[in-house]
């Protein structure tokens, strides 16, 4: 762990994670590694299951320092799903937080690690770019997960490009509210480590706690998904924030306009697990006429639009040193990565994301882009959340159906959509819900919405 050792030597008393300094975390990591070593002596790959915590970071750093590949498990999966992933990746040792140890048979809790007999070890400092650091499993269109190997080269290229784009300042303190088993949370930890700045790790979204930390100036950076930002935007003090990194799903344009009016430093971003987080970003306050874009590529990232129509809309492909070479157990994808998203580039190089290709609804030969209709629905102040999905139809192939959460009558919503939309775009049904289903990072789970 070259970066941790370096920062502990250069900035021993600087706050790193919560109230712990770089020197303290470095010391804890080395101690943890001594207790872990005899447990995993003959293991090249292990798994880690935990809620967000400083202790999770310490265990992860220790495992990485011992040159292990670490599968980061999603804490929200069932016992069956966890067992399936552990078996598929041929893992024998699973380390869990004390809260989650019962979810995995024969797992070793963080408390139990400390009871093992310590063994003196020397942690690896440098790793070749191609060495796998962590593995993250991501959903696939087939329903079976795909395993994304995150290499040290990907991480290194990401933190450098991110620093060049977002900057790094001595007083930066990034709130880690998104899950650390997900690329959105882990990338913050790695940026903070590389930049020698600070991060505050919390386990769950607590609106009052979040507002207190931001409005008191304790933290000045945060990554959020739109559903979380929608709940707190009106209550934020913009002068205490350096940036809000916003991504993870399609961002309603009315939310962006509101943030613009409030002067909130929103950095829209576009990325994925396969690219170790962001590939594209920009500050909406710097480019007020580009707010419907997701930004410009980070240094080293190239975007290609393939199979474009006459309007320049086509499939988004990426080239980047932050990209994986292949999913585990699969062939390399070649020189460019097919994102599965549809969009276009403007003359200034800004990327516009229209939809996930798999989410586009084709009804009677006409393409319906859910984002277009969702942006329209979000323009109504009564709407909290919405999602437009496809329903199979014998006559048209597919028809759009709408799911919403909000305080609005069905009649008012139907009249609004009838006035604003062509007939083929209008939802064939509207379902009201208290809250739309979401995954651990706050994305709406469209596949669970069925008519």
From Swiss-Prot:
<protein>
    <recommendedName>
        <fullName>2-succinylbenzoate--CoA ligase</fullName>
        <ecNumber>6.2.1.26</ecNumber>
    </recommendedName>
</protein>
<dbReference type="Pfam" id="PF00501">
    <property type="entry name" value="AMP-binding"/>
</dbReference>
<dbReference type="InterPro" id="IPR000873">
    <property type="entry name" value="AMP-dep_synth/lig_dom"/>
</dbReference>
<dbReference type="Pfam" id="PF13193">
    <property type="entry name" value="AMP-binding_C"/>
</dbReference>
<dbReference type="InterPro" id="IPR010192">
    <property type="entry name" value="MenE"/>
</dbReference>
<dbReference type="InterPro" id="IPR025110">
    <property type="entry name" value="AMP-bd_C"/>
</dbReference>
<keyword id="KW-0436">Ligase</keyword>
<dbReference type="InterPro" id="IPR045851">
    <property type="entry name" value="AMP-bd_C_sf"/>
</dbReference>
<comment type="function">
    <text>Converts 2-succinylbenzoate (OSB) to 2-succinylbenzoyl-CoA (OSB-CoA).</text>
</comment>
<comment type="pathway">
    <text>Quinol/quinone metabolism; 1,4-dihydroxy-2-naphthoate biosynthesis; 1,4-dihydroxy-2-naphthoate from chorismate: step 5/7.</text>
</comment>
<keyword id="KW-0474">Menaquinone biosynthesis</keyword>
<dbReference type="GO" id="GO:0008756">
    <property type="term" value="F:o-succinylbenzoate-CoA ligase activity"/>
</dbReference>
<dbReference type="InterPro" id="IPR042099">
    <property type="entry name" value="ANL_N_sf"/>
</dbReference>
<dbReference type="InterPro" id="IPR050237">
    <property type="entry name" value="ATP-dep_AMP-bd_enzyme"/>
</dbReference>
<comment type="pathway">
    <text>Quinol/quinone metabolism; menaquinone biosynthesis.</text>
</comment>
<comment type="similarity">
    <text>Belongs to the ATP-dependent AMP-binding enzyme family. MenE subfamily.</text>
</comment>
<dbReference type="GO" id="GO:0009234">
    <property type="term" value="P:menaquinone biosynthetic process"/>
</dbReference>
<dbReference type="GO" id="GO:0005524">
    <property type="term" value="F:ATP binding"/>
</dbReference>
<keyword id="KW-0547">Nucleotide-binding</keyword>
<keyword id="KW-0067">ATP-binding</keyword>
């Amino acid at each position: 762990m070259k970066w941790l050792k370096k920062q502990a030597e250069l900035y021993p008393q600087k706050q790193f994670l919560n109230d712990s300094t770089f020197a303290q975390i470095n010391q804890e990591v080395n101690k943890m590694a001594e207790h872990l070593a005899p447990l995993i002596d003959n293991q090249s790959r292990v798994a880690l299951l935990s809620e967000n915590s400083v202790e999770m970071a310490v265990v992860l750093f220790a495992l990485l320092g011992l040159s292990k590949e670490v599968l980061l498990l999603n804490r929200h999966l069932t016992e069956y799903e966890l067992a399936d992933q552990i078996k598929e990746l041929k893992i024998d040792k699973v380390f869990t937080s004390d809260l989650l140890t019962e979810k995995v048979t024969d797992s070793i809790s963080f408390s139990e690690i400390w009871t093992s007999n310590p063994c003196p070890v020397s942690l690896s400092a440098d790793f070749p770019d191609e060495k796998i650091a962590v593995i993250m499993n991501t959903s696939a269109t087939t329903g079976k997960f795909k395993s994304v190997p995150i290499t040290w080269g990907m991480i290194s290229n990401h933190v450098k490009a991110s620093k060049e784009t977002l900057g790094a300042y001595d007083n930066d303190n990034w709130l880690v509210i998104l899950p650390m088993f997900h690329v959105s949370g882990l990338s913050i930890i790695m940026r903070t480590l590389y930049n020698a700045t600070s991060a505050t790790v919390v386990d769950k979204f607590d609106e009052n706690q979040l507002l207190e930390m931001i409005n008191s100036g304790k933290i000045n950076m945060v990554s959020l998904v739109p559903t979380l930002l929608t709940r707190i935007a009106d209550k934020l003090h913009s002068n205490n924030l350096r940036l809000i990194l916003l991504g993870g799903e399609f961002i309603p344009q009315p939310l962006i306009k509101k943030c613009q009016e409030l002067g909130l430093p929103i950095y829209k971003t576009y990325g994925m697990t396969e690219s170790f987080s962001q590939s594209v970003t920009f500050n909406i306050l710097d480019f007020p006429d580009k707010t419907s874009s997701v930004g410009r590529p980070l240094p080293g990232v190239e975007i290609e639009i393939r199979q474009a129509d006459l309007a320049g809309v086509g499939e988004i492909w990426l080239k980047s040193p932050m990209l994986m070479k292949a999913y585990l157990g699969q062939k390399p994808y070649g020189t460019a990565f097919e994102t599965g998203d549809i969009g276009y580039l403007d003359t200034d190089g800004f990327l516009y994301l229209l939809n996930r290709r798999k989410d586009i609804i084709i009804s009677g030969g006409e393409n319906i882009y859910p984002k277009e209709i969702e942006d329209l629905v979000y323009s109504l102040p009564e709407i909290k959340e919405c999602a437009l999905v496809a329903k199979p139809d014998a006559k048209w192939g597919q028809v759009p159906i709408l799911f919403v959460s909000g305080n609005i009558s069905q009649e008012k919503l139907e009249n609004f959509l009838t006035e604003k939309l062509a007939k083929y775009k209008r939802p064939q049904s509207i379902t009201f819900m208290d809250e739309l289903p979401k995954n651990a990072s706050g994305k709406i789970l469209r596949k669970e919405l069925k008519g």
